[in-house]
Amino acid sequence: MAFLRQTLWILWTFTMVIGQDNEKCSQKTLIGYRLKMSRDGDIAVGETVELRCRSGYTTYARNITATCLQGGTWSEPTATCNKKSCPNPGEIQNGKVIFHGGQDALKYGANISYVCNEGYFLVGREYVRYCMIGASGQMAWSSSPPFCEKEKCHRPKIENGDFKPDKDYYEYNDAVHFECNEGYTLVGPHSIACAVNNTWTSNMPTCELAGCKFPSVTHGYPIQGFSLTYKHKQSVTFACNDGFVLRGSPTITCNVTEWDPPLPKCVLEDIDDPNNSNPGRLHPTPNEKPNGNVFQRSNYTEPPTKPEDTHTAATCDTNCEQPPKILPTSEGFNETTTSNTITKQLEDEKTTSQPNTHITSALTSMKAKGNFTNKTNNSTDLHIASTPTSQDDATPSIPSVQTPNYNTNAPTRTLTSLHIEEGPSNSTTSEKATASTLSHNSHKNDTGGIYTTLNKTTQLPSTNKPTNSQAKSSTKPRVETHNKTTSNPAISLTDSADVPQRPREPTLPPIFRPPASKNRYLEKQLVIGLLTAVALTCGLITLFHYLFFR
């Protein structure tokens, strides 16, 4: 029982304390006032205090009092503290001032803002000003007023064109007129004006290559707006020839470099077409092409075939035992007959061919078989023999070549005959082919003629110029001899001056010959000496200037 009484006592005491705290008045609720005697904490209920106006407020009364009431409220103060007012902010040129707060717009805590007229923009640190207590304790605005400046635009840019007037900058509503260079068309407005925020009233125009290509409509022609050249925004109207109808827009306009809408088309008029404005009109006669082909709508005629292109082939109805024979055409080719004919001709030529007397061709042919050697120089004829490996290696037919005649008045000379001996190495029989004697007109001069001899290294004819003694001895006729006892066939060269040849042209001396190495060395040393002298001279001049003129 005692414990219960003690608990109730504690709860009652706590409630009374809380109730007393709630009955106090806060100093913060005194708007525009503050305690004349500063103190901390809240004011108890029923207590009366002296007040004064806060900063930014003013009153005409000397003493102001207020009492704390039940519920934590204050009684009405005996005098009113009113807000102080800031001075008139004034007007702004090319703009206006906007006041906020109604009647208290110029009083303590109020704010004002500035707005410029169209075509102007604000210039200043702050666009909003507040009424506040200044450094001296007087009411003042928070900042200096801004001002309105006219809008400006930068210089425009246009390629392949120009604009007028040309200025460093343009103010609001200043107009600029554009024009393009020759050969270009202006696409866009011809004039624009400066707007707000460094912008223009429209997008910048451009200068494009002027004109469109000449419009060509097949089976059509222009009836209005014909011109050789078409500029931007220029139009042309088309019509079709008789027998053709227009598909598309008859009038097209040049848009920069393209036609808008696209070019129309002229098509053949169809009498069954319900959209045909002229029913019953006949189709025009199509033009014949040079090759004879005729082309019409839904009509195509193949060109006639040539008679020689027609081939007749045998046909069988049923049960063919052998394939039919293909008849040859007028220009046909019989492969079997031709092959047999060619084979027979080759055999006849091999049988009837005789060795030729041209010495150069014969030597070349024998060299290819590899059966010739060089005999002693004292021999008086040229003996060539070869051993064929088969019957097919008979002496081939060598075409004769006529030796040119250089001098018709020169005496006739006889060349050594060529003897060709062929046969198997183990057989006593041999086929002898004696080359006919060649007669040439040799040209004589003081130094002797030029003749062809067999080169010992290459085993081929070469051109030599004999000495006077050789030239004199070569005038004697040559006698053909054959060495039949020799087992090894060989080539014997006796006289190297047999075939006259055209003399070679002399070798010209070189146009430019490099200078001797000694002269070039002297020139190099001379250049080095000159450069050294120049360097020493410059050094002496610099030293002289440093010593006497510094």
From Swiss-Prot:
One of its GO terms (biological process) is symbiont-mediated suppression of host complement activation. One of its GO terms (cellular component) is host cell membrane. The keyword NADP does not apply. The keyword Nucleotide-binding does not apply. Keywords: Disulfide bond, Glycoprotein, Host membrane, Host-virus interaction, Inhibition of host complement factors by virus, Membrane, Repeat, Signal, Sushi, Transmembrane, Transmembrane helix, Viral immunoevasion, Virion. Gene3D superfamilies: Complement Module, domain 1 (2.10.70.10). Disulfide bonds join C25-C68, C53-C81, C86-C131, C116-C148, C153-C194, C180-C207, C212-C254, C240-C266. This is Complement control protein. The gene is ORF4.
